[in-house]
């Protein structure tokens, strides 16, 4: 029997507000433990919450960008549970009437088809504190308590771990592009839980689901869902009874581990938050927020394909972050060579950034300087290989490519007569390579070209070198 997965994701995005959701404490990441706190976020007796207007604005903005309907009347609710990281012993969240409902994200499958993944709801809530486990015991840091979140709950429309990854990637790019969250998974500002069950292909009856936590990267998400799918299929095939439970992804051992049996909604005893009034959202406010939404990543990618004539894949990669998209567009316009710009950004520049773990905004050179480098190569002033060396220098120093080329004497040699002398010398000193070439070994020419480039310290025009080596070898 063939099975398919039924997957839904719950994504928590930390909002990029300056202050917490119900008080004036800073949301800045880091800081000494328990220094970004006050009586409100510590839940001290007598303290009263006040809803941060910017949080509501960001909730509306996210909902509009994700094709949701905005609930014009919504409320906050108490979710009751006892855990050390929850200082009030309840979380102020939204239950029955969230701020947004019924949205979707469109993803592109491997075969090029597009698929809509439904979004059931988006609700606002506060984050909990953070537990720090030591040999001596467990400590609690409440700096994160009260930091505003939106939870985006998808419908169970996802059928493979790969689809789940595409959904999360698209969601991340949208949220970061509208600047409601920085979506830094390594800092916990974007967190994802997954719900998965399996059912026979063609069936409409979902199986017993498991919730998986601790999936803190795209790779972890895909691996955890794949593992859990295999575990469910094996259990069902053997006739075992699966129970609804919450499991944790163990990255070190590549397995999911049981945490607890799954709670039900009534275990949390939800009821309206009496210290906060019902929220009324006007049509005028919604339209004001709508005007602040920029061109979304998929819209920008489509425009790049049409305007700059770059491949669809390039456009999708370049629009994963708005900083990269902006850098590309500015460089492409200045260099008048969009494909070369795309190649440099997706290739050598991305490699250098990954090596140093930095982002586009941290680069020491600007789009104008990269455009200058591309123009130097296209004009034949320097070769592509020399261009890579110049880029390395630009990356370290931030100097302009022209200055680097002049300082280091890297101007390309286009003098055929001078290059021909070197070619003849190399051929004369390597008779075996000529013999190999005559015997049908085409790679022998590549060897000779490499020797010429080495002799000229990479300054000879590669096209001229290739032409002259081929001509001289055929004369022998």
From Swiss-Prot:
Belongs to the GatB/GatE family. GatB subfamily. Its EC number is 6.3.5.-. PANTHER family: GLUTAMYL-TRNA GLN AMIDOTRANSFERASE SUBUNIT B MITOCHONDRIAL AND PROKARYOTIC PET112-RELATED, GLUTAMYL-TRNA(GLN) AMIDOTRANSFERASE SUBUNIT B, MITOCHONDRIAL. This is Aspartyl/glutamyl-tRNA(Asn/Gln) amidotransferase subunit B. Allows the formation of correctly charged Asn-tRNA(Asn) or Gln-tRNA(Gln) through the transamidation of misacylated Asp-tRNA(Asn) or Glu-tRNA(Gln) in organisms which lack either or both of asparaginyl-tRNA or glutaminyl-tRNA synthetases. The reaction takes place in the presence of glutamine and ATP through an activated phospho-Asp-tRNA(Asn) or phospho-Glu-tRNA(Gln). NCBIfam families: gatB, PRK05477.1-2, PRK05477.1-4. Coiled coil: none annotated. It is an enzyme of class 6 (ligase). It comes from the Bacteria. GO terms for molecular function: asparaginyl-tRNA synthase (glutamine-hydrolyzing) activity; ATP binding; glutaminyl-tRNA synthase (glutamine-hydrolyzing) activity. Heterotrimer of A, B and C subunits. It catalyses: L-glutamyl-tRNA(Gln) + L-glutamine + ATP + H2O = L-glutaminyl-tRNA(Gln) + L-glutamate + ADP + phosphate + H(+); L-aspartyl-tRNA(Asn) + L-glutamine + ATP + H2O = L-asparaginyl-tRNA(Asn) + L-glutamate + ADP + phosphate + 2 H(+). Pfam families: GatB_N, GatB_Yqey. It comes from Clostridium botulinum (strain Langeland / NCTC 10281 / Type F). The lineage of its organism: Bacteria, Bacillati, Bacillota, Clostridia, Eubacteriales. Keywords: ATP-binding, Ligase, Nucleotide-binding, Protein biosynthesis. HAMAP family: GatB.
């Amino acid at each position: 029997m063939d099975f398919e997965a039924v997957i839904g994701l719950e994504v928590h995005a930390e909002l990029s507000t300056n202050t917490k959701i119900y008080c004036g404490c800073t949301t800045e990441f880091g800081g000494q433990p328990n220094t970004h706190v006050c009586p409100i976020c510590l839940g001290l007796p007598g303290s009263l919450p006040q809803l941060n207007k910017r949080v509501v604005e960001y909730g509306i903005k996210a909902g509009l960008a994700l094709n949701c309907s905005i609930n014009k009347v919504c409320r906050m609710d108490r979710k009751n549970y006892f855990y050390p990281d929850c200082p009030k012993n309840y979380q102020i969240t939204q239950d029955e009437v969230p701020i947004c409902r019924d949205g979707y994200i469109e993803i592109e499958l491997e075969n090029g088809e597009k698929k809509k993944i439904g979004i059931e709801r988006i609700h606002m809530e506060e984050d909990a504190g953070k537990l720090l486990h030591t040999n001596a015991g467990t400590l609690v840091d409440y700096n994160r308590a009260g930091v505003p979140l939106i939870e985006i709950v998808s419908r169970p429309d996802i059928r493979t771990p790969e689809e789940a990854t595409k959904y999360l990637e698209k969601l991340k790019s949208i949220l970061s592009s509208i600047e409601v969250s920085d979506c830094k998974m390594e800092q916990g500002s974007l967190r994802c839980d997954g719900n998965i069950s399996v059912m026979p292909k063609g069936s409409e009856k979902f199986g017993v689901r498991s919730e998986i936590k601790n999936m803190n990267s795209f790779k972890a998400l895909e691996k955890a869902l794949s593992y859990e799918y295999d575990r469910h299929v094996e259990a069902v095939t053997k006739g075992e009874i699966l129970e609804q439970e919450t499991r944790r992804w163990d990255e070190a051992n590549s397995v999911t581990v049981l945490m607890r049996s799954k709670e039900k909604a009534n275990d949390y005893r939800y009821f309206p938050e009496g210290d906060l009034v019902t929220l009324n959202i006007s049509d005028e406010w919604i339209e004001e927020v709508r005007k602040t939404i920029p061109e979304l990543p998929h819209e920008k990618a489509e425009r790049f394909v049409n305007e700059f004539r770059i491949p669809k894949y390039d456009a999708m990669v370049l629009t994963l972050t708005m900083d990269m998209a902006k850098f590309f567009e500015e460089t492409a316009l200045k260099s008048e060579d969009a494909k070369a710009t795309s190649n440099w950004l997706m290739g050598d520049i991305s490699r250098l950034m990954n090596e140093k773990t930095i982002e586009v905004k941290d680069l020491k050179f600007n789009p104008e300087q990269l455009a200058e480098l591309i123009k130097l190569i296209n004009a034949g002033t320097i070769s592509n290989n020399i261009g890579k060396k110049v880029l390395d220098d630009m990356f370290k120093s931030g100097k302009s490519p022209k200055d680097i080329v002049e300082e280091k004497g890297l101007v390309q040699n286009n003098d055929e007569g001078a290059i021909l002398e070197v070619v003849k010398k190399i051929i004369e000193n390597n008779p075996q390579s000529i013999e190999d070439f005559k015997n049908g070994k085409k790679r022998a020419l590549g060897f000779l070209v490499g020797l010429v480039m080495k002799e000229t310290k990479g300054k000879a025009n590669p096209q001229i070198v290739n032409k002259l080596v081929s001509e001289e070898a055929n004369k022998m």
